[in-house]
Amino acid sequence: MSGLLPSRLVDNQEIINLVEHHSKGVFQGDLPKMLKTIEKLLNKSGIETRYWLNNDETPMTLMKTAFNSALAQANINKSDIDLLIYASVTRGFIEPANSTFISKALGLNCRNYDAVDACNGWVTAMDIINSKMKAGEIRHAMVVNMEFGMSEGGPGVPQNFTLHSADELDYKFPSLTIGEAATVTILSNESPDNFNFSYINRPDLSDLCTISLPKWELFCNEEDIERNAPTGGQYQFSSYAAALHDEGKSELIKVFYQHKIPVNDIHQIFTHTASPKMMGLVGEFIGANGNLYNIGNKTGNIITASVPFGIADAIEQGKVEKGQFCMGWVASAGMVFSALSFKL
């Protein structure tokens, strides 16, 4: 496994400065008061910094570097890879699959496709690969996660840093927590029974976190339109954080217990990085005090790269070793809640 962050360090004060810059002149109300509210919300989330692309960096270059590192760790040739899954939220193409451009960049001719499942993308890709390995269809597979959505003109900048009213913060605030990252996970079929997966699906909450495309209203329910209308069709990230957290806490706890693994048997639990403090509170509830590995305070919310980057970071820091029993624990838009357990 390999994970890389871009080099531009962005702290919370820079985020506040960006909001002030983009909102000055258009905000209807007390802007200094709103900036104080943002500061409090960022502190409440537990996120202190995040990393964005510098001017001399590209997602493809970082991905290639991560791939070369992961391939060296796996001690295989790239021609041994039978399947590549691109499992990110951020992407450049609806058609063809983004995986085709990744395969082209890496000189791969294996079967490849995208798995789209919001922040749960990596878990879903791992589940697909695990099923294919159990069926004896593939020997080696790779998951690529490239979360790079903070460049100008993307789903968050500048539109979600531009506040016209206090009400907009309800669905724009999560953009202020986003970081960027690239991860590559390579798997072999040596132990096809290594992974176990549990899920809870709540499609009734699908309108809480979206990035919609033109004519989006043709592809949802009438009751979904009101919440999505402010950003509908604009390729703009919309996420109602308060509602997500209210619903997410109980479902995260449920999916953990549904997995039926005693918390004391788990060496490290790798979590979604959306809100380190919220995950910490949920972790305390299940008794996961010393074994919750959440690097969101330094990375920000790195979306689908959260769990794989956490694993790669823990390996690099000497926090986990081969053979230790671990878990991934994710709350995602959709909403989807997942737990997967495995030995490294």
Q: What positions do the PLM features span?
A:
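Condensing-enzyme catalytic core mediating Claisen C-C bond formation in acyl metabolism
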Residues: 1-55, 166-242, 343-344
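Short glycine-rich phosphate-binding loop at a beta-alpha junction
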Residues: 79-87, 264-272
